[in-house]
Swiss-Prot record:
Keyword flag DNA repair: no
This protein's name: Nucleoside diphosphate kinase
Function of the molecule: Major role in the synthesis of nucleoside triphosphates other than ATP. The ATP gamma phosphate is transferred to the NDP beta phosphate via a ping-pong mechanism, using a phosphorylated active-site intermediate.
Gene this protein is translated from: ndk
Active site as annotated: 117 (pros-phosphohistidine intermediate)
Main EC class the enzyme belongs to: transferase
Short name of one Pfam family: NDK
Endpoints of the signal sequence: none
Catalyzed chemical reaction(s): a 2'-deoxyribonucleoside 5'-diphosphate + ATP = a 2'-deoxyribonucleoside 5'-triphosphate + ADP; a ribonucleoside 5'-diphosphate + ATP = a ribonucleoside 5'-triphosphate + ADP
Any single GO BP term: CTP biosynthetic process
PROSITE patterns, per the entry: NDPK, NDPK_LIKE
Gene3D superfamilies in the cross-refs: Nucleoside diphosphate kinase-like domain
SMART domains: NDK (SM00562)
InterPro entries: NDK-like_dom, NDK-like_dom_sf, Nucleoside_diP_kinase, Nucleoside_diP_kinase_AS
Amino acid sequence: MAIERTFSIIKPDAVAKNHIGAIYNRFESAGLKIIASKMVQLSKEQAEGFYAEHSARPFFGALVSFMTSGPVMVQVLEGENAVLANREIMGATNPAEAARGTLRADYAASIDENAVHGSDAVESAAREIAYFFSADEVCPRTR
């Protein structure tokens, strides 16, 4: 199996409800290592840049507004098949459709406030990691 890196955001709704520790526990319990992490308050420009691929979609304005409504936790996760592993931990985008025991089933209120973001591919993970972290902020864990 391939050791990969993926990018994750704990969104403003989950941060406001103090779910950071519980979500980190889920990552680590699934064998993912947190190799970079920080809390940030996204500016409108940062949110628009990060979600630029959705700029033509009708929900874009609401997404940017939500993502700038409070601080978020951004983190880099590393582990075997990390992209897929994190997506399985997160569950379906719509929490009403998310499998029981997934982050979105347990911590999300709606499809709009769905607690977490995770990269959908190794390539997007690399781009998203670089958007928030410099190379010297990522600390591989070899033990």
